[in-house]
A protein has these predicted regions:
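Membrane-integral, polyisoprenol-dependent glycosyltransferases
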Residues: 2-183
């Protein structure tokens, strides 16, 4: 039985391939990430019960300036840290003339998720070397559970950034301990 291999071992007959440079890959990844983050942020009303509770907490900050203990209408104690409602209230005040309050709060998720993507990319670059940050960002974007939860009004989005920054600090510790302690 005879096998015939038609392979050009020297590369004489191969057609020239156009290769993409690193800057082009970074630009394409940034465009993909921006489109992915912005896709579900505006245009839909809060449909999960936790979203309306968080909108109520942000509107309590906006209307009565209760920055000490922002509470939702049905709460008597603080369940989540107030950083997410504070940033959401800032976005509501900035974009109140253009967007509905729940859309402005969702727009603050752009900041949280962008910083999370950057932190994950830096952590991966620190652990595995240059060129792997984009791959980790693509894996992060492709996570099934993330797609449903990133575009909602939840304080867990800011906690995700905290975890990503902590992991980046742990990865950076051996090479630059002072900078890692600042992260």
């Amino acid at each position: 039985m005879k096998f015939e291999l038609n392979h050009d071992w020297q590369g004489n007959m191969s057609s020239p391939r156009s290769t993409l440079g690193d800057k082009t890959k970074i630009h394409l990844f940034l465009i993909l990430a921006i489109v992915w983050v912005f896709t579900g942020l505006v245009g839909n009303s809060p449909w999960i019960p936790a979203e309306s509770e968080n909108v109520s907490m942000v509107m309590d900050i906006v209307s009565s300036n209760s920055i000490i203990a922002p509470l939702a209408a049905s709460q008597d104690s603080i369940n989540n840290p107030p950083l997410y409602p504070f940033i959401g209230a800032t976005f509501v005040k900035i974009f109140s003339s253009i967007l509905a309050p729940h859309d402005a709060i969702r727009l603050s998720n752009f900041i949280w998720i962008s910083l999370t993507l950057v932190s994950i990319g830096l952590m991966t670059r620190e652990l595995w070397g240059t060129g792997f940050g984009r791959q980790a960002g693509l894996i992060f974007i492709a996570s099934i559970g993330l797609i449903f939860n990133v575009h909602t009004i939840r304080p867990e989005v800011s906690a995700l950034l905290g975890f990503a920054l902590a992991l980046y600090g742990f990865a950076l510790y051996y090479r630059r301990p002072f900078r890692a302690s600042l992260v």
